[in-house]
Regions:
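Extended active-site and interfacial segments that coordinate phosphate-rich ligands
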Residues: 1-12
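Active-site-proximal loop/turn and secondary-structure-junction residues that shape catalytic pockets
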Residues: 130-133, 185-189
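Extended, charge-enriched "interface" segments that sit outside catalytic cores
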Residues: 13-180
Length: 203
């Protein structure tokens, strides 16, 4: 999970920075929208260091400056919490570019990165988990008899560890990266309920 996340974030950073460097549109001739100005003001509050650096190399080029700060936001204290948050900022830039007449930039490179984020998010792949319904039933029986912290069977421990791993992945990289769980040989609603109960007990 970490490998795919790191790979994707670095690729998006490179692409975002490349787009930003090529957005040489002076505010005098390509007036930024109020929405873009608000985004820039938010970036200034969030990181004076990043915005000062972007402004230094993008004087009077607000679209460029905003994109360069977006590219820098992969450090822990400033990084985007989700791909949707990153998409929101990209769309602000796109709408501003389109409104000021820079249609080729808005629906060319900016649209391309938007499609990429919509398709793959920050995760690139979606992990799938699968377990037999009988294993779930046996694990629950074991937990009910011995307690979640009791002397449990190795398979029960494996089931619990799996749910905890899913939770950890979702918390760190987003729910979309690990949101598919398949119950093999499901024959009743109880088999689905077992999974929810195990997930609840695991945390």
């Amino acid at each position: 999970a970490a490998k795919y996340f790191t790979h994707m974030v670095l690729k998006l950073e490179d692409k975002c920075r490349h787009i930003g460097r090529n957005l040489t549109l002076e505010a005098t001739y390509s007036k930024p929208s109020a929405e873009l100005i608000n985004l820039w003001n938010h970036q200034v509050e969030m990181s004076p260091r990043y915005t000062a650096r972007a402004e230094l190399i993008s004087e009077h080029e607000p679209h460029r400056a905003v994109m360069l700060v977006m590219a820098d936001r992969r450090i822990t204290d400033t990084m985007y919490h989700s791909a949707d948050e990153f998409l929101d900022d990209l769309r602000v830039v796109q709408r501003s570019l389109a409104a000021c007449g820079a249609v080729r930039a808005a629906y060319g490179p900016v649209q391309t990165i938007i499609w990429q984020v919509e398709s793959f998010g920050f995760h690139m792949v979606e992990m799938e988990f699968r377990q037999h319904s009988v294993v779930h039933a046996r694990a629950l029986k074991d937990i009910h008899e011995n307690g979640i912290h009791g002397d449990l069977q190795p398979m029960t421990r494996e089931v619990i560890d799996t749910f905890r791993a899913i939770g950890s992945i979702q918390k760190r990289y987003g729910k979309k990266m690990a949101h598919r769980y398949i119950i093999s040989f499901t024959k009743s609603a109880q088999h689905v309920a077992d999974v929810f109960e195990l997930a609840h007990l695991s945390f």
